[in-house]
Amino acid sequence: YEVYNQQIIPDLAKNNIHILHVSKLDEKQYEFIRRYFNDELMPVLTPMADDASRPFPFISNNSLNIAVQLRRQIHPTSKPVAEEILEGDQEVHRPQIEPHDDRQEADIKFATVRVPEIYKRLVRLPGENNFILIDEIITEFLTALFPGYEILATASYRVMRDMDLDVAEEDTSDLLRAVKRQLREREHGRVMRLEVPASIDEWLKDQLIDNLHVSERSLYEVDGPVDLTFLKKLSGMVDGHDDLRYPPYKPYLNPALDMDHNIFSSIRQKDYLMQHPYDNFQAVVNFIHQAAIDPDVLAIKMTLYRVSGNSPIIKYLGMAAQQGK
């Protein structure tokens, strides 16, 4: 986060690329996010409360969420934020979350809102290369999700759960069924890491620690947005600035290992050492492909780890299995 705050953000700004906070938006940009919330986000958001009538909401692994501290309004005096309308040059209404020192514990509630993964984390704003985080948009208009309540504090957070599989092959007669059961159960594994912003309200932090059963050493307070993986997508969203981009890297494929050559003949003559990503993995795919269709190959034995759903390796292994290998 030191690199993010002291290098990445300033360097982006020098090149007129901005990740803006709500407080820095002009009227046109603010009206844009208001409409974006109403039209795109609000229909898919599901606020979940924690009270005596229901258990603490389940927080799935690696999901981004917004924790909310609420208090019921006795005399609501304003409409939900999302109903505000910008007309002409009228000043944009920007509701502020007011701190309260006289909080009554009986009236204070905890709620959480999951940030939908179907939308990009970065939202493009009007203006050249201006962006805002989707969780900032949701936070700005939370009052529309909780009518009749006052928002006292908010904070984005993310949990990482123990996703290890623990299957003892010698103790089960049906390994496939045991693995399937473990895959379902690991989604509810214990929380190994809780990430929150360093500015989080103490009450919210205590609620998360207590209800997620997290130890203090598993709590990570970060100086910036929770989950910086959105930066991976930024380069593809920025217009222009080709001078700032790395040239595309093309891995090397040895001609002796392509499909136009018999790879078995090539490796009889010499050994080939490949290092990914510098060497093209297609050489391995070609090798398995040729082994699958070569009638002199009796069996293929290999170790696979986390293959994709459309893996060509799986395709050719299936082809080999159909031929009795």
Where do the PLM segments sit?
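N-terminal localization/anchoring segments of enzymes in phospholipid and broader phosphate metabolism
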Residues: 1-325
